Design a protein with these regions (language model features):
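A feature for loop-to-transmembrane-helix boundaries and adjacent hydrophobic helices
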Residues: 1-259
């Protein structure tokens, strides 16, 4: 396979440029909205205005948390020398783990406003997220960023600009963290489940998928490996997710309340 070298700019209007990466985020929020809307048809617990607020709060959390998380976890030194890079979102540079923290904070605020239970809301939100993650990884692929390690494997992709082949880990993540995780959570949550269990499965499976893919993903050059010449920042951030997910899932089985 050969990397198609897609122009990251969809349309140049002169006074503004429209980027594929930004469009992927729009697709993510639209997909979350329509998935949520299809779910509330079967439930009297949600009103349309609450759903719209939920997506708005989530979008703010994703964008602010994702960008600040990337700066803090992956690019703090460049930010200190040039704070303006925080606004250069069109070039990529979003952290899933930062986005997750941003969504958690935004959901705390949402639940405070509507006096809802935090975990019941998160159980509703969790199945809406994976397709958006998949769109984001496709945006990374179009941007030509977050490649895997150099490889001569038939699963690798030839990159003409570098004259080498690398694992297209963006596509692996789009498939596992996007499509497969969506199917798991959507089917699981289609029936009544104990409170926290859907949120727990999201943490477990995302953490596992990300941890595994990191073995063939090229670590950030300015960070490298954190320990033992194989532990990456992504793995260091994902492992606690798995542990927390297992804990919440075990706790949910002792919880009689239903999401």
């Amino acid at each position: 396979m050969t990397y198609p070298n897609i122009d990251p700019v969809i349309l140049d209007l002169g006074f503004a440029k429209i980027y594929w990466y930004g469009l992927m985020y729009i697709f993510a929020f639209i997909s979350a909205y329509f998935l949520a809307k299809s779910r509330i048809k079967k439930s009297s617990q949600w009103k349309l205005n609450e759903l719209e607020d939920l997506i708005f709060y989530g979008a703010i959390g994703v964008v602010l948390g994702g960008r600040l998380g990337y700066i803090f976890f992956y690019n703090l030194s460049d930010f200190i020398s040039n704070p303006a890079i925080i606004f250069e979102i069109q070039n990529g540079g979003m952290s899933f783990h930062g986005g997750l923290l941003g969504v958690i904070i935004s959901m705390v605020l949402f639940n405070r406003k509507y006096k809802r239970d935090f975990f019941i809301t998160m159980d509703f939100v969790a199945p809406l997220v994976p397709l958006g993650l998949g769109f984001g990884r496709i945006g990374n692929f179009i941007n030509g960023e977050l490649w895997g390690k150099v490889s001569s494997s038939s699963y690798a992709m030839f990159i003409p600009q570098e004259n080498i082949s690398r694992y297209p880990t963006q596509l692996y993540e789009a498939f596992l963290e996007g499509l497969i995780l969506f199917v798991i959570l959507w089917l699981y949550s289609s029936k009544e489940r104990s409170r926290m269990s859907t949120s727990a499965l999201f943490l477990i499976f995302y953490g596992l998928f990300r941890f595994i893919i990191e073995f063939v993903r090229e670590p950030d050059q300015h960070i490298g490996y954190l320990a033992f010449d194989w532990i990456t920042m992504g793995q260091a951030l994902s492992f606690p997710m798995i542990l927390l997910g297992v804990y919440l899932f075990m706790k949910s089985n002792k919880n009689a309340s239903i999401s």
